[in-house]
């Protein structure tokens, strides 16, 4: 229904002011901080998307995905028996089989997510995008992170964008689909809102801010606009769509701020791995350092924490 987006206007100054207020929020402390950080861990898509990825470093990542926080630290927080893991492991299609096998080896049912559809640029013929998605699913990916064609957004080809995402959704089959908008390359916040709505209308299970490869990745103004779109879509259809900020989320405070923003904009029901993810490669390390400090009262040295 293109009528939903034809008259969209985003008050950029108001959005930016709201984002500035978010940055000034006082962070939680003590046990509350530890609880929020453990919640963040369960929402992380632990990611490696490098040209030099190998079966060995993917295997280490998968082990860390199952054991994100040191066992003795979890025992000190009385959380050792809660089965805390990250939400998913995210890799390139060529590394999906490595990740699936590594997780099986440690008896872990964490889903493997694969980027696809011409990631990160989206400058790939649709036939190739669909074939890549199907291969990733065939290899064992249970979640697919596609990336949209920014060209279709910037030239206002909304029906073509809808059709491309719809075909990607069809190619995913039973796998969940997250649609990456690459918001830093969409030109304006109105386009972010419109692309969000089109992606949801086409069947996306999640909408995601960024590939992590753009100059500008997950920002609070973009997050506010995308979450308002999710809320509007829910009011119109009754369907809940997930939200995933990704790129540049490196610190424990970043994670807590995103969690608090989701709670304010969408409500506590979105604070689950089924509806909220954090795309990150280095975030988990900082979270574990903060939990180490909370439990021991001292800063973690390099040898204190396992490498991912």
Predicted regions and their residues:
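Charged, compositionally biased N-terminal leader segments and the immediate start
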Residues: 1-41
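Alpha/beta enzyme core
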Residues: 30-41, 52-84, 93-244, 250-281, ...
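A short, histidine- and acid-enriched strand-loop-helix "catalytic/donor-clamping" loop
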Residues: 49
